């Protein structure tokens, strides 16, 4: 007997904004979504700040959005949790951090601090990095090296120079810290197994290989002069003595797991082979600020995960219902790991489908990404009648939005419009209901206030939520209107 599905479509990065200038969502031709929004019950939802467990005014992100949706409640996030620990003083007595620093003193080794250097608050926060540097000074460490990964996505694309200048000033004030490596997140924070990128970051960190520039601020400026903004800065070595060596302590200050896993595994997993390790594997005292992966060996965790109970996937499973999670690579972790409360757990009756994301340098080069392939696979499984619930993510509005290329983002929105219609129609044919929403905004703002500079970050704008019972696509002429 065929099941009647309830399909949840999460349009990643699809925010609602009144202003139309630089608004790829408002200006895209999207006859399907326009009709769905006009003819079905719906509302706007807040996807930022306190409503999703973040500090007031903090933009939402994919991890936070999927965690809250999957939990069915406000889940307070790691950003405010760590910030509160700093304010309360508990941060400075954290057992994992203390142990790593005491190990340095006992063995005469160096402390390496890695992290995304920005105040974007999505993967990390510069104030958390500064707090750890203060702690290292207080505990009497003499050799501290910071490996700064530049952002350019959750903050303006050329803001990294100012963050590096702030870090350099902090190092000079403390007197015991130096900037070792500067790298764009494109290399050091890949999450799609693009090991050629990760190799460059690893070689800079461990071998000191890469362009050398002793002035960190000038290193970033040289990249700008070459037309390369923060996200894509090729790993630069600023201090030859700052290479990571055996028995050193490493603290990775990123609190969001997905983009911290690959470079961490390169450093801690003796069985890892996807990146060449010319020095071979060597032991480290490695601290993950949060739990990046329960299978990660040879690490300690500073802020362990708080387990969520009775979340959506768990509840559906307990009812004896079947569920499907489907997305392309860039958002697969979000409909699985994050939707399940940040736990690597597959519930009974839960199936997962991963569609590979296209192998392109940046997604403005292929704004449709793998949305049509995701749709094909989803429709096939809807029509199989095997699932009671389907959780689906379309990555385009977020991933293309992050490139800052307006025209590509507009095309991304139009692709999502086409694909949403196919999924809704398939669900309707099976007698099911489709819920359409988003996790946060992004493509709704592609330009800074000057109307020229690309805006690459998320937004704090609301997102849609609609319940669709029956739907058929408009005629082809509506697409050309």
Q: What kind of region is each of these model predictions?
A:
Residues 443-467:
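Conserved, well-ordered active-site substructure
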Residues 471-481:
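Single conserved hydrophobic/aromatic residue that forms the stacking wall/gate
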Residues 412-451:
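Metal-dependent active-site segment of extracytoplasmic phospho-/sulfohydrolases and closely related
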Residues 41, 51-54, 58-116, 123-142, ...:
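His/Asp/Glu-rich, glycine-adjacent segments
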Residues 13-14, 118-120, 291, 440-441:
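Active-site metal-binding loops of divalent metal-dependent hydrolases
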Residues 95-96, 386-419:
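Active-site His/acidic residue clusters
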Residues 8, 112-114, 251-252, 389-393, ...:
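Structural motif
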Residues 1-40:
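Active-site-proximal N-terminal segment of extracellular/periplasmic enzymes that hydrolyze or transfer
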